[in-house]
């Protein structure tokens, strides 16, 4: 993928298996509120280095799974061609956030420091839990810090004292973890 492509589009879901003979297909949403995926249209897929626009026409829920009817997809074999493709959106369709709210895409690749400005590592991913999100931080090559991933609760302001998305920097405090 080109850098430009990565900067414009964001993966928010994935197509699953075709359902029935009329062209319906399962969709697995990655959005926090699963049904919000339908607020972000049009959708796109990347196929053989080309971006293809996908327009959902109808959707319904069957056994906790979204079934979607796509414009111009009228039978099972057409729907099967979409199976396992990531569903992308243009990042400009995302709503503006309030202060101290962040999209995961903006947190990933941030450098994490402690309050003494010691670099602890870089955020590689986030994990959603019922109580709070968790930063997965790839440790830096610093004495007394292991090469294992650090799991840091994303609790602002209890543990996270600063998030600067523009500078890709997160500062943590009050964090007691043994890095052995």
From Swiss-Prot:
This is Ribosome maturation factor RimM. GO terms for molecular function: ribosome binding. Residues 99-179 form the PRC barrel domain. Its main location: cytoplasm. An accessory protein needed during the final step in the assembly of 30S ribosomal subunit, possibly for assembly of the head region. Essential for efficient processing of 16S rRNA. May be needed both before and after RbfA during the maturation of 16S rRNA. It has affinity for free ribosomal 30S subunits but not for 70S ribosomes. Keywords: Chaperone, Cytoplasm, Ribosome biogenesis, rRNA processing. It is found in: Cytoplasm. GO terms for biological process: ribosomal small subunit biogenesis; rRNA processing.
């Amino acid at each position: 993928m080109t850098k430009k492509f990565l900067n414009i589009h964001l993966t928010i879901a994935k197509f699953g298996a075709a359902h029935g003979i009329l062209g319906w297909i399962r969709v697995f949403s990655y959005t926090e509120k699963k049904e919000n995926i339908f607020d972000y249209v049009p959708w796109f897929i990347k196929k053989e280095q080309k971006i293809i626009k996908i327009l959902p026409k109808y959707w319904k829920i069957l056994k906790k799974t979204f079934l979607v009817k796509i414009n111009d997809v009228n039978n099972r074999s057409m729907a099967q061609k979409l199976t396992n493709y990531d569903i992308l959106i243009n990042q400009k369709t995302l709503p503006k956030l309030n202060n101290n709210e962040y999209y995961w895409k903006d947190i990933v690749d941030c450098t994490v420091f402690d309050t003494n400005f010691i670099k602890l590592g870089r955020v590689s991913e986030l994990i959603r839990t019922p109580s709070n999100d968790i930063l997965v931080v790839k440790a830096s090559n610093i004495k007394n810090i292991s090469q294992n991933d650090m799991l840091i609760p994303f609790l602002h302001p209890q543990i996270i004292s600063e998030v600067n998305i523009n500078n890709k920097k997160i500062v943590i405090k009050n964090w007691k973890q043994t890095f052995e």
